[in-house]
């Protein structure tokens, strides 16, 4: 800053005359630098002037993002950039053969004003698994966590305040940048991570959803349904648009082998509650291993003392459940009030007005852990600021 430079010039002019004054001025300047840096840090921590309660779930560019490149068998040092644009070769593997994976996690402002992330180590591990399945070089776990920390710190002003109902959604992704004209893995890749503030994933928030059983398949048997890759989500777009046009909030995808078992929706896992209060989650090799579902299972067992069963769930048994919800990073838990199966309506006793009692307890407990109002299991919360 200019005021510090002026002090430095004055200091040098008197240095030869009085070393004691030099020491005193040095102390004063160091103190000024500390005060100025503190003020600058406070300014960067000031939240953006946004209507946090009504921002919706959409992309909003923030200040900085992280970029690292893989070439000649190794990742470079990586670093932050303010440029949101990606420039790649016209024959890049991502453009020709959809070689891409991604993750989703959130940063939260807790009750005490800290900024934290929720179980980012699991996102790093899942992304490494996805990379191996698509023949891509895994981005190291520690570097993934460092990238998350850097992006959150650089965009701290974009992390919504506590109690706003909004969060900073973080999107790590990796794609093939090297030119590939034959069907084979690329030799070059780019890892990027950006953040964007978001509100609830579903417009109605906690209002129960109406779903329809889809005629389309999300994944193939022994395919990539368990991998968080863009190609899986591209496959669901037509089904999603068709469902929305018919007035439904989401699709219910069935197992592609027999079309008799519940899998998931286009962007979330299912969670059911029996009339006896038991939590049931569908089990299938083609379902994405949701970190939110895994966390809810732990919360149900260890915080709420509920019985939890993970097993295949038949479409024909849905009317035996008392509650139904969709869970994922974006949605957390969204209640489902009704599922329509080609004219047959399955209405859950929890109704169309609010979350069922067990679903509500699960939601309140998990979000309480994320926001710092409920003590978290060891290792679940990573404090960044």
Q: What function would you assign to each model-found segment?
A:
Residues 163-171, 175:
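Extended, Lys/Arg-enriched charged tracts that mediate electrostatic binding to polyanionic substrates
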Residues 5-8, 40:
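Methionine residue identity
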Residues 142, 151-165:
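Charged, gly/pro-rich active-site loop segments
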Residues 40-151, 173, 180-385:
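Helix-start/capping segments and mature chain N-termini
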Residues 4, 14-15:
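Residue-level detector of alpha-helical hydrophobic segments embedded in or interacting with membranes
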């Amino acid at each position: 800053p200019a005021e510090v430079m002026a002090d430095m010039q004055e200091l040098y002019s008197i240095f030869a005359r009085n070393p004691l004054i030099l020491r005193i001025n040095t102390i004063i300047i160091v103190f000024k630098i500390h005060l100025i840096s503190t003020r600058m840090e406070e300014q960067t921590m000031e939240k953006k002037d946004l209507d946090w309660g009504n921002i919706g779930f959409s992309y909003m560019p923030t200040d900085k993002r992280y970029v690292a490149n893989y070439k000649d068998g190794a990742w470079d040092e990586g670093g932050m950039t303010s440029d949101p644009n990606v420039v790649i070769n016209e024959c890049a593997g991502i453009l020709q053969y959809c070689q891409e994976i991604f993750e989703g996690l959130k940063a939260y402002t807790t009750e005490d004003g800290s900024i934290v992330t929720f179980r980012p180590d699991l996102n790093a591990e899942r992304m490494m698994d996805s990379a191996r399945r698509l023949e891509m070089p895994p981005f190291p776990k520690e570097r993934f966590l460092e990238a998350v920390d850097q992006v959150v710190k650089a965009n701290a002003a974009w992390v919504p305040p506590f109690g706003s109902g909004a969060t900073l959604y973080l999107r790590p992704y990796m794609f093939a940048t090297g030119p590939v004209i034959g069907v084979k893995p690329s030799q070059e890749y780019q890892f990027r991570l950006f953040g964007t503030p978001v509100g609830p994933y579903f417009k109605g928030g906690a209002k129960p959803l109406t779903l329809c059983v889809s005629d389309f398949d999300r994944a193939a048997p022994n395919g990539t349904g368990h991998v968080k890759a863009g190609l899986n989500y591209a496959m669901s777009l037509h089904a999603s648009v068709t469902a929305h046009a018919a007035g439904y909030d989401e699709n219910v995808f069935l197992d592609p082998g027999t079309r008799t078992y519940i899998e998931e929706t286009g962007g979330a896992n299912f969670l059911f509650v029996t009339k006896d209060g038991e939590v049931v989650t569908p089990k299938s090799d083609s379902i994405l291993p949701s970190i939110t579902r895994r966390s809810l299972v732990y919360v149900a067992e260890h915080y709420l003392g509920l019985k939890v069963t993970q097993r295949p769930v038949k479409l024909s048994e849905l009317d035996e459940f008392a509650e139904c919800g969709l869970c994922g990073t974006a949605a957390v838990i969204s209640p489902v009030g009704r599922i329509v199966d080609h004219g047959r309506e399955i209405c859950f006793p929890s109704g169309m007005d609010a979350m069922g009692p067990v679903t509500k307890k699960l939601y309140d407990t998990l979000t309480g852990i994320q926001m710092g109002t409920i003590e978290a299991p060891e290792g679940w919360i990573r404090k960044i600021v």
